[in-house]
Regions:
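Generic structural motif
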Residues: 101-107, 120, 153-155, 163-166
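Acidic, Ser/Thr- and proline-rich intrinsically disordered linker/docking segments
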Residues: 3-10, 127-194
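Anionic N-terminal interaction surfaces
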Residues: 2-16, 21-33, 37-112
Length: 194
């Protein structure tokens, strides 16, 4: 397919998503809430049978890859949270469990930087500032599309970190929930990531 026909097809339905893909995305969202290999397999099969070109379903393929990575992380979670080696000074003596490039779209300057999830806090390093949110102060951690959202217990602050991929958002939100749950309990066992 030529560039012109691709642009023309896209301009015929700007911002519109085929109802079959909307149904698939709803099924994906349900699968993310209760991830299983069976659900991922059914989603992959359903996506293949929809009959769209790979260009038309590249976002859905990325969503499916993110679900698979979440499953891998959950399976390896029996050995504890992954530990990433980082020489970042802001981490200090904390164990780092996640690192990904992100932006903060809700901030006026929309800074880009890196989100680090450590044993004690979430740290954003980028732009003109560093944001540090201790796990004991986080009331809720979740994902929304490619975003990791941390909401403070006092509900006065919401931190939205936009990831470059669904996989990063799903993995980061999962690890954040684990770290929030253990924020005031005994240290979490950790597995070294190779």
């Amino acid at each position: 397919m030529g560039l012109f026909s691709w642009l023309k097809r896209r301009s015929e339905r700007p911002g519109r998503v085929d109802p079959k893909l909307l149904d698939w995305r709803s099924a994906w969202a349900r699968a993310v809430e209760q991830p299983s290999a069976d659900a991922a397999g059914r989603l992959a099969e359903a996506l293949d049978t929809l009959g769209f070109s790979e260009e038309d379903i590249e976002v859905e393929r990325e969503m499916l890859d993110g679900l698979r990575e979440l499953l891998d992380l959950r399976r390896s979670g029996d050995a504890g949270l992954p530990i990433l080696e980082t020489g970042h000074r802001v981490i200090g003596s904390d164990r780092c469990h996640f690192s990904a490039p992100v932006s903060m779209p809700d901030e006026d300057s929309q800074p880009s930087g890196r989100l680090l999830l450590t044993s004690t806090r979430a740290v954003f390093v980028g732009g003109a500032r560093t944001a540090s949110i201790p796990w004991h102060a986080v009331g809720q951690a979740r994902h929304e599309q490619r975003d990791i959202i941390l909401i403070r217990k006092n509900r006065e602050n919401l931190y939205r970190f936009r990831c470059n991929s669904f996989a990063d958002a799903l993995r980061g939100a999962f690890l954040s929930r684990q770290l929030v749950a253990h924020g005031q309990r005994a240290p979490i066992p950790s597995a070294t990531r190779s």
